């Protein structure tokens, strides 16, 4: 099995100055691991969701000035893209690795999914583990811990996805850099698999909704 766990030098990619310079290092150092993670987890996600999952590695092609502060591989049930669909992500900032179920702002039907989550609020609050986190913007590293959100705060998150055009909803885990570099490959992959098996619960809600 190829090495997929991120090392210190992978995280250090995001300290390289300049768009071209950082992208060169990212392509050489980080992208091969993202591609390997994609190949490893696409069959698992296909199996546990019942949808054939396709791999999409972030290319950052639209960037012309500012270098990326994070990068990722996404999994969605379409070859054509993932941003408009409920999807899964594995990626990293210079401080941590993230594993997400994601509804991001490009989704034309995220409002309908937000309504569905609001209806299932009590169940979701009980099912999501206390050490999981929520995000309302995939472009920022800030998160809200599930253990610190009461029902009203969670409801506000779900309502925001319905009413705010740029609103997003992501749920999953963050693994601190310091922990990741101490893991072996198997431990790292096991953490990701456990997270995916948990957030698939949210993905299944979107499968039930005909939108």
Curated annotation (Swiss-Prot):
UniProt family annotation: Belongs to the UPF0637 family.
Protein name: UPF0637 protein BPUM_1363
Pfam families with a match to the protein in the record: DUF1054
InterPro entries for the chain: UPF0637, UPF0637_domain_sf
Source organism (scientific name): Bacillus pumilus (strain SAFR-032)
């Amino acid at each position: 099995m190829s090495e997929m766990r991120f090392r210190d030098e992978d995280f250090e990619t995001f300290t390289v100055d300049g768009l071209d310079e950082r992208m060169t290092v990212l392509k050489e150092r980080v992208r091969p691991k993202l591609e390997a993670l994609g190949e490893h987890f696409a069959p698992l996600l296909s199996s546990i969701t019942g949808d054939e999952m396709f791999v999409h590695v972030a290319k950052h092609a639209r960037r012309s000035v500012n270098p990326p502060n994070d990068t990722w591989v996404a999994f969605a049930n379409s070859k054509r893209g993932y941003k408009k669909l409920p999807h899964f992500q594995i990626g990293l900032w210079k401080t941590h690795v993230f594993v997400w179920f994601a509804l991001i702002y490009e989704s034309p039907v995220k409002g309908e999914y937000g309504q569905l989550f609001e209806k299932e609020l009590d169940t979701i609050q009980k099912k999501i583990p206390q050490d999981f986190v929520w995000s309302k913007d995939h472009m920022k590293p800030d998160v809200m811990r599930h253990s610190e959100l009461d029902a009203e705060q969670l409801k506000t998150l779900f309502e925001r996805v319905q009413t705010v055009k740029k609103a997003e909803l992501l749920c999953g885990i963050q693994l601190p850099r310091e922990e990741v570099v101490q893991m072996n490959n198997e431990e790292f992959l096991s953490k990701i698999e456990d997270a995916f098996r948990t957030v698939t619960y949210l993905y299944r809600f979107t499968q039930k909704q005909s939108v």
